[in-house]
Amino acid sequence: MTRILVALAFTVVVAGYPQSAHAQVGKPVTIVDANTITEADLAKLPGMTPALAKDLVAKRPFLSITALDQFLTGAGLTREQITALYGRIFIHVNLNSASRDEILLIPGVGNRMLREFLEYRPYAALAVFHREIDKYVDDAELARLEQYVFVPLNLNTASDQDLLTIPGLGTRMLREFKEYRPYDGIERFRREIGKYVSKEEVARLERYLTLAK
């Protein structure tokens, strides 16, 4: 009975949030996804050059913020330059599986906030992050932090609105995602979506998804 009441309470709390809080990928406030930003816009950012922007685009997609961080470090950017750049571009981190080091790459996240991120795992929805982290920061800081994270979307049940929060997923690819429902395994997703995009892009999209019930 207690579990049922807790589940009902959670449902009510999540339902009580504005629709934007339901999105499973944090809404951009100051950043653009590093895998989808144009080369021209990238070249204008602090610490970037046209040559570095071109090289970064050629190396995409990056499947984690760690991979992007290694690229930028290898390109000779200082930690200060990289941190400043992460105020403008980033690769979302999975709230449920990101390593401590990945989370600490989010600008302004120190050991104290890291503990709060980890304390509430596993996150059933981004609304849980919104509710729990709201205890520690104001609304502006909450929105800033939320833009760096995501909770995987269920490939079989996610709404159109939620799926469209995946960076770079437009209405055409949304139709392809839905056409092959229900998916009986991730291999089918890879096979079917691989008809339309490269295997690297399939892997980039896949990181935002789950088939777990």
Feature annotation, model-predicted:
Residues 49-50, 110, 170:
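Small-residue hinge/turn detector
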Residues 52-97, 113-156, 173-212:
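Accessory alpha-helical DNA-binding modules that contact the DNA backbone or grooves
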Residues 42-46, 103-107, 163-167:
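Short amphipathic alpha-helical boundary/capping segments
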Residues 32-37, 93-103, 153-163:
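Disulfide-bonded cysteine-rich modules in secreted/extracellular proteins
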Residues 30-63:
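N-terminal targeting signals for Sec/Tat export/insertion, comprising classic cleavable signal peptides
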Residues 18-25:
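Boundary at the C-terminal end of the N-terminal hydrophobic targeting segment
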Residues 5-16:
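Bacterial N-terminal signal peptides
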